[in-house]
A protein has these predicted regions:
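Sequence/structural signature of beta-propeller domains
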Residues: 1-115
Length: 115
C-alpha cells in the first residue's frame, strides 16, 4: 500500500508483511532520503487503505486503517501471542475480527517531517 504526496514530496508506505510482529505506516521523504515511522498497527494486523489528501481547506490528511489484528504468522513466538492476545480480544472484539480506520492531520507546514 503506497501513496505519494507531490506537495510534501513524500512517499507513504503501509506495510502488510509477515516478517515482523507489527506492521507500520512509513513516510519516505524524497528530497532528504529520510524514512520515518508514523504509526503502528496492532500485533499481526496489516495496514490498509492508505490515502493522502494534500490540501483540504489548508489541512493535510494521511489516512490509514488496519485489519486482521492478531493474525500471527507461524514465526510469531508464543510470548507475543500471550501478551497481545487479551488486548486485541478486548479492543477489537476478538482475534482477526477487528479493524479500525483513522487519520493524522495538520497544516501542511506542520506535517513536514523535517525542518
Amino acid at each position: 500500500n503506497i501513496k505519494f504526496s507531490e506537495k510534501l514530496r513524500t512517499l507513504f508506505i503501509g506495510e502488510d508483511s509477515g516478517n515482523h510482529v507489527s506492521n507500520f505506516v512509513w513516510a519516505y521523504e524524497l528530497d532528504t532520503g529520510r524514512l520515518q515511522r508514523l504509526l503502528s498497527a496492532p500485533a499481526g494486523a496489516e495496514c490498509t487503505g492508505l490515502q493522502g489528501v494534500d490540501d483540504l481547506n489548508g489541512w493535510t490528511y494521511i489516512l490509514s486503517g488496519f485489519q486482521h489484528a492478531g493474525d500471527y504468522t507461524s514465526a510469531t513466538v508464543q510470548a507475543v501471542k500471550d501478551a497481545a492476545g487479551p488486548a486485541i480480544t478486548t479492543n477489537y472484539k476478538g482475534l482477526m475480527k477487528g479493524a479500525a480506520i483513522g487519520y493524522i492531520s495538520g497544516k501542511s507546514v506542520a506535517v513536514r517531517l523535517t525542518k
